[in-house]
Amino acid sequence: MSKLTVCLFLIVFHFKCVTVAQEINQYDAAGKRHGVWQKNYKSSKQLRYNGSFNHGKEVGVFKFFDSSGGHPTAIKEYTTDSPFVDVTFYTTEGKKVSSGKMKNRKRQGEWLSYHQDGSTIMIKEQYKNGLLDGQRNVFFISGLPALVEQYVDGNKEGKAITYTEEGKVLKSVTYKQDKLEGPAIFYNGYGEKEVAGNYKNNRKHGLWKYYKNGQVDKEIKYPRNKIGVQ
């Protein structure tokens, strides 16, 4: 290969690199981001994110990376005819952490979180304007329920039931505006009742019954007096 050929190759290669660099991170006439954009972390050359804009609006797929590199830790997919964005979070090894939709950067509708295998559902929950709203289910790796509870505007509301891995009810409590309020029953791992009573403003209130071998063993009324004696 002649020196002239080598020089021409280097010139063409440099021109292509400059052209590619000029094609990313551009603005339109109104000063809005347009076309392909990508940014690196300040402390390194590691890519932080890449994606495309259409006159200031995100379009298509955006990928976000951890400073250590690896698989994208978040992938967001935008569509031009919908206000919702499909979002999936990953570990740097590429296993799913959670997935769902966002609107105006707030979670909306059903979101799923996954066990460490990245495929088995661990949590299924509902969001409204970024707040938990509706039924929230937590599952063991087997798929059996571990917890079923209700939310309204980000607060626990109504009955919440916790289960053992064998499917036995471990406890059933009631919430009002994120505080324990109303009936509560606690069981041992065999499904036998151990304690039952009521809460008021997050504290035990009224008569609580304590069971032994299926029978009431003692009763305590709350609140108790200062020296702790009924």
Predicted features and spans:
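Glycine/tyrosine- and acidic-biased, solvent-exposed loop/turn segments at the edges of beta-strands
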Residues: 17-230
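Bacterial Sec-dependent N-terminal signal peptides
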Residues: 1-25
